[in-house]
Structures are given as C-alpha cells and as structure tokens.
Amino acid sequence: ISSGAAFGVVLMLFLVPGNAFGWLMPAGSIGAAVTLMIILIASGRGGFSPHRMLLAGMALSTAFTMLLMMLQASGDPRMAKILTWISGSTYNATASQVVHSGIVMIVLLAIVPLCRRWMTILPLGGETARAVGMALTPTRVALLLLAACLTATATMTIGPLSFVGLMAPHIARMMGFRRTMPHIVMSALTGGVILVFADWCGRMVLFPYQIPAGLLSTFIGAPYFIYLLRKQSR
C-alpha cells in the first residue's frame, strides 16, 4: 500500500504542471486505492487468504519500487523535489498536512476497537473463525481496507516507512503485549518512538547534513530482522 501511494505521488508530479504538492493527498489516495484493488483481485480466488495477499503485496511493492528507480535514473529534475519524501522524511510535512492526517487518523483509529473480536479470532485459523459464525471473506476485506487507509494516510504525510510498520508489532509482542488491543496500542506507540528516534538521529548524527528517517529506520530494521530470523531458526 505504501509503495502504491508513493508511486501515485511521483506519477502526479510528472503529470501535473507547476507546484504539484497540493495534489499530494489525492494522488497518494488514488495510488493506494488502485494498489488495494489489485491485491483484492489477485487474492480473491483464494478467499483472501493472508498468504495470497502477502504474495500479491510483495509483487506489487517490487514492481512499484522498480518503476520509481527507473524514474529516478531518468535524471528528470522534478525527481529531486520529491526524493527526500520517497526516502521517508518529516522535513517537508506542513502543519496543514499534519492536521488533515491527524483528523483522518483519529476517525480511523476510533474504528479499530470495533474490530477487536475479528482480530482476536482470525489468528486462530479459518476453521475456528467459521465455527463461531464469522464470515471470513468480508471480515478480511474490511480489515484490509482499514489497514490500507491507515497506511496510506501515514505514507502521504511523511513518505514510505515500511520498516517502522514491520518492526513495531514484533517489538511490542516481544515486550509481552500479546492480547489484541494492548498489542495494537503498544505497536502504535513503539512505531512513534522509532520514528522520532530515527528522525532525531538523522538530524544530529551528520549535522548540519540530514538523513531521512526512513533510511535510518531501514538501516536499523534490516539487522533486527536478521536477528529475528536467526532467533527463530534456533
């Protein structure tokens, strides 16, 4: 979803003349929506199973990353305007963008507690979910829509920060927060702390030069996931 939103913003930059940053939110929303639609179509025949959705998402992320790299390699001067945003940065976030994103986030996060039962039962497996009367396909689609909207809103504000979204739930689980709502709350808080820490390091480590928070979080996250893989293999 974040890669689709990023590609939508970059494509808008090439199509809209002049100062196109006012179209950032609509372009990112369209990119995220198109990405979500493709994932739903690709995984629909399998009953929207997590594995099929994961594979479809990985394939789309790879495709969008390749297209973004091609646009960067083209040498177009317009890419320089948005290169920092693609790297995941708070530098270009304006007060109006933060306010708009904050309002959307509050509305979406208010829906999360209503889905607590779904998120508690789904990890137990499809058979268990059906046994308690849960409709698997509509439930998975609804949760995917909610997650996609939350991801797109964050991406349009500060750019793609995939590793923060990957690290935070694992860290929260390692801290002992395994029940659904405590895990979600702690994941959000942990992700915020990681972002603030990466942003602070990016501004201070090579001062007066600045490193985007997305690059630093990836630098931190890659060794962390290697550590997790080694730990699980043992």
Model region roles, listed by residue range:
Residues 1-234:
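Alpha-helical transmembrane segments in inner-membrane proteins
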